[in-house]
């Protein structure tokens, strides 16, 4: 299955990136939600600026769509420096990373998305760069090969990952600041939807923004995506005016239910309930039953279902909770 086919998939879609950039917050004062992260970053950034230092290297982790890239942009804006962006899979060779590092200005931010996917060769080059602001490069081949050191300007590496556990210990230990992004509260998502609606010039009331927020799975990227589809519906059917009834109609038509579930969420939960009698069921069996890759279940589908209390991950496998049974109007089996 292709994750991008899902309207509520938290992953980024290329066609949305330009539109999302236009409505992203640029500074911490505009940043909504994640209060602990925001307050800590305010202190760390202000302290670095007072000292005239580069900000310590920053690792941001959490489920997709929660604003890791947005936070990296905010850090660069607050520090008043350039942001250079790349990703783990793109940096195939040590020379790819070396080219980026040697082009940095003092205190610049280098943002590496999916940093857990760095190759070991590239990661080895990163260690002295992060720790000593030095680049070790091998010149020549065979017996004539020699290592030279290149001094780098002080810089900030921001790494983003959905799989912090996949990082090697040496890499993880070199980050001075580690921030975990959590799923957003509905009230914060409502503020995000309202802010995006204003930027898009939409006529939308508070009840409508709340309706979109409640179905956005705690994820700003999904909230903005649903908002754009609600806008389309309103423009065609309701002269562009978005109230709670219009938003609800649009989202129902898009097959996004009151919990923010789409057909894949319902398919997973119903597979556990119907095919495995509520579980426990192993991940491989569950992946085969719904025709998905186990990584997609672990990284994309499960986190929200577990966080919302519809699915349990146990040593024996996945289990549907009473809340999941009730969601589908099915009576859960009585415990012996």
From Swiss-Prot:
Mg(2+) binds at residue 69. The keyword Repeat does not apply. Gene3D superfamilies: 1.10.8.60, P-loop containing nucleotide triphosphate hydrolases, Winged helix-like DNA-binding domain superfamily/Winged helix DNA-binding domain. It holds the Pfam family RuvB_N. Residues 185-255 are annotated as: Small ATPAse domain (RuvB-S). GO terms for cellular component: cytoplasm; Holliday junction resolvase complex. It is an enzyme of class 3 (hydrolase). Disulfide bonds: none annotated. GO terms for biological process: DNA recombination; DNA repair. GO terms for molecular function: ATP binding; ATP hydrolysis activity; four-way junction DNA binding; four-way junction helicase activity. SUPFAM superfamilies: P-loop containing nucleoside triphosphate hydrolases, Winged helix' DNA-binding domain. Its main location: cytoplasm. PANTHER family: HOLLIDAY JUNCTION BRANCH MIGRATION COMPLEX SUBUNIT RUVB (PTHR42848:SF1), PTHR42848. Has 3 domains, the large (RuvB-L) and small ATPase (RuvB-S) domains and the C-terminal head (RuvB-H) domain. The head domain binds DNA, while the ATPase domains jointly bind ATP, ADP or are empty depending on the state of the subunit in the translocation cycle. During a single DNA translocation step the structure of each domain remains the same, but their relative positions change. This is Holliday junction branch migration complex subunit RuvB.
């Amino acid at each position: 299955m292709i994750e991008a086919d899902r309207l509520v998939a938290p992953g980024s879609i290329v066609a949305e990136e330009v539109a999302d950039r236009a409505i992203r917050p640029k500074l911490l004062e505009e940043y909504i939600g994640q209060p602990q992260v925001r307050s800590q970053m305010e202190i760390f950034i202000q302290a670095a600026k007072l000292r005239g230092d580069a900000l310590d290297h920053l690792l941001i982790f959490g489920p997709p769509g929660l604003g890791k890239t947005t936070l990296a942009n905010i850090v660069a804006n607050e520090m008043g420096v350039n942001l250079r962006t790349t990703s783990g899979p793109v940096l195939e060779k040590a020379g790819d990373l070396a080219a980026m590092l040697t082009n940095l200005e003092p205190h610049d931010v280098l943002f590496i998305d999916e940093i857990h996917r760095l190759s070991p060769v590239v990661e080895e080059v990163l260690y002295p760069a992060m720790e000593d602001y030095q680049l070790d490069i091998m010149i020549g081949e065979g017996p004539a090969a020699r290592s030279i050191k290149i001094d780098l300007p002080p810089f900030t590496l921001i790494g983003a990952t959905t799989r912090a556990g996949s990082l090697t210990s040496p890499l993880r230990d070199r980050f001075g600041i580690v921030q975990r992004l959590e799923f957003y509260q509905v009230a914060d998502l409502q503020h995000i939807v309202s802010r995006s609606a204003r930027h898009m010039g939409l006529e939308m009331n508070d009840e409508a923004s709340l309706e979109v927020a409640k179905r956005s799975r705690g994820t700003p990227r999904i909230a903005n995506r649903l908002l754009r589809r609600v806008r389309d519906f309103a423009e065609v059917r309701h002269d562009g005016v978005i109230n709670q009834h219009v938003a609800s109609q649009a989202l129902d038509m898009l097959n996004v239910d009151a919990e923010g579930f789409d057909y894949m969420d319902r398919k997973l939960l119903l597979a556990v309930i119907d095919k495995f009698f509520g579980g426990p069921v192993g991940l491989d069996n569950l992946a085969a039953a719904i025709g998905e890759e186990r990584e997609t279940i672990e990284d994309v589908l499960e986190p929200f279902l577990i966080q919302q209390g519809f699915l349990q991950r146990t040593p024996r496998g996945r289990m549907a909770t009473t809340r999941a049974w009730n969601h589908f109007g099915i009576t859960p089996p009585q415990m012996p």
